[in-house]
């Protein structure tokens, strides 16, 4: 029988796999309160969001068209004349507004809303999610896709935002609509997917070695080994037999 990875250990495994192990101490996880993956991810996300809200959500300028008194920004003369607003001293202008209602915060907000629909989350954790949602400023809920998350994670983000977005991505990847239950979602246990867990463990192993073994092994990388070109492979060359190419999970090398 396959042994389950302890919940707290899984959180450390994921943080190393995502390359954000330096953020581990910023979000505390109580293993005794997290007896399931959906509860674990919910707890990590609302604790992370509480931290983001305290330090201030990411803000950016967004191009908007607004009706204003006088002129501000770039005047849209055609729309102003067409609407007749100028007769009352008002205009329609295109302005840049500094706002927290930006894509990355929309993804986080929408993920919190998604968690509220997942069956199996404990009521005390659901209450914390509800409390965290109430703290958010006006942010639009959006449809989150794998493509959108992938593009956001390619940006230069702070380590903490990178952690939060990876949690969001895992939640969206692991939820499906429940059959015959309108609006409710089922959480899929990704630890039962051997291929997915192999990928996670490979990334964990690589990043763990890079961070903790550099002093003794300066070079940490993956390596392709072509047995056909090795002395052992040459023995089979004349027979026409092919040997496989192997890719290591991680190779540690000390040139000394």
Model region roles, listed by residue range:
Residues 150, 185-195, 228-233:
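Active-site-proximal beta-alpha loop/turn segments in soluble metabolic enzymes
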Residues 154-158, 187-206:
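A short, highly charged nucleic-acid-interacting micro-segment common to nuclease
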Residues 1-186:
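Terminal, charged accessory segments of proteins
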Residues 220-255:
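Active-site metal-binding core of divalent-cation-utilizing nuclease and nuclease-like domains
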Residues 191-192, 197, 212, 221-223:
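Conserved adenosyl
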Residues 38, 161, 198, 202, ...:
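Active-site-proximal structural scaffolding
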Residues 174-181, 206-221, 254-255:
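Secondary-structure boundary elements
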């Amino acid at each position: 029988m396959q042994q389950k990875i302890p919940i707290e250990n899984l959180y450390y495994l994921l943080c190393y796999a995502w390359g954000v192990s330096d953020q581990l101490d910023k979000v505390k996880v109580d293993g005794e309160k997290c007896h399931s993956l959906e509860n674990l991810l919910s707890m990590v996300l609302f604790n992370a969001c509480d931290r983001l809200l305290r330090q201030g959500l990411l803000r950016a300028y967004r191009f908007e068209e607004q009706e204003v008194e006088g002129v501000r920004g770039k005047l849209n003369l055609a729309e102003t004349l067409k609407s007749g607003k100028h007769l009352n001293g008002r205009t329609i202008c295109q302005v840049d507004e500094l706002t927290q209602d930006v894509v990355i915060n929309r993804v986080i907000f929408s993920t919190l809303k998604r968690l509220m629909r997942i069956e199996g989350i404990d009521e005390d954790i659901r209450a914390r999610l509800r409390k965290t949602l109430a703290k958010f400023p006006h942010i639009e809920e959006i449809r989150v896709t794998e493509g959108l998350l992938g593009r956001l994670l390619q940006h230069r983000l702070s380590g903490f935002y990178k952690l939060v977005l990876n949690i969001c991505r895992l939640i969206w990847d692991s939820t499906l609509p429940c059959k015959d239950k309108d609006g409710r979602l089922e959480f899929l246990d990704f630890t039962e997917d051997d291929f997915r867990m192999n990928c996670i463990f490979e990334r964990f192993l690589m990043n763990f070695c890079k961070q903790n073994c550099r002093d003794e092994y300066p070079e940490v990388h993956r390596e392709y080994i072509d047995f056909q070109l090795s002395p052992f492979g040459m023995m089979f060359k004349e027979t026409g037999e092919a040997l496989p190419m192997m890719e290591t999970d991680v190779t540690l090398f000390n040139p000394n």
